[in-house]
Swiss-Prot record:
Highest taxon, organism lineage: Bacteria
InterPro entries reported in the protein's UniProt record: NADH_UbQ_OxRdtase_chain4L/K, NUOK/Mnh_C1-like
Keywords annotated in UniProt: Cell inner membrane, Cell membrane, Membrane, NAD, Quinone, Translocase, Transmembrane, Transmembrane helix, Transport
Protein name listed in UniProt: NADH-quinone oxidoreductase subunit K
Reactions it catalyzes: a quinone + NADH + 5 H(+)(in) = a quinol + NAD(+) + 4 H(+)(out)
Subunit structure: NDH-1 is composed of 14 different subunits. Subunits NuoA, H, J, K, L, M, N constitute the membrane sector of the complex.
Enzyme Commission number(s) of this protein: 7.1.1.-
Organism annotation: Chlorobaculum parvum (strain DSM 263 / NCIMB 8327)
Mode of membrane association: Multi-pass membrane protein
Residue spans crossing the bilayer: 7-27, 34-54, 66-86
Principal location: membrane
GO molecular function: NADH:ubiquinone reductase (non-electrogenic) activity; quinone binding
Length: 105
């Protein structure tokens, strides 16, 4: 029973790669600004999982500190990006990034 409960580095890294891949897929293929922001958040969460995984198996606190920094950075990025998306929606009545190619106003 003990061998089934142990989670190794490979499990964490696999989850991280899946999250990163989903985030990159969302950023590269979608045109909706909100979905793109969600993809960026998935990429940042994948980086957090990597930092915490290597921190756990290395024994240092550097990964935790980097992870906290990324969380703060993600919160600031989300606030600024959502403000920009709201202004784009008010101006152009859409959040489609392909239709917003010029910012004349």
């Amino acid at each position: 029973m003990e061998q089934f409960l142990s989670i190794g580095v490979n499990h964490f890294l696999t989850i991280s790669v899946l999250l990163f891949s989903l985030g990159m897929f969302a950023v590269m293929t979608r045109k909706n600004a909100i979905v793109i922001l969600m993809g960026v958040e998935l990429i940042l969460n994948a980086a957090n999982i990597n930092f915490l995984t290597f921190s756990k198996y290395n024994g240092g606190m550097e990964g935790v500190m980097f992870s906290l920094f990324v969380i703060v950075l993600a919160a600031a990025e989300a606030a600024v990006a959502l403000a920009i998306v709201i202004n784009i929606f008010k101006t152009f009545k859409t959040v489609d990034v392909s239709s917003v190619d010029t910012m004349k106003e």
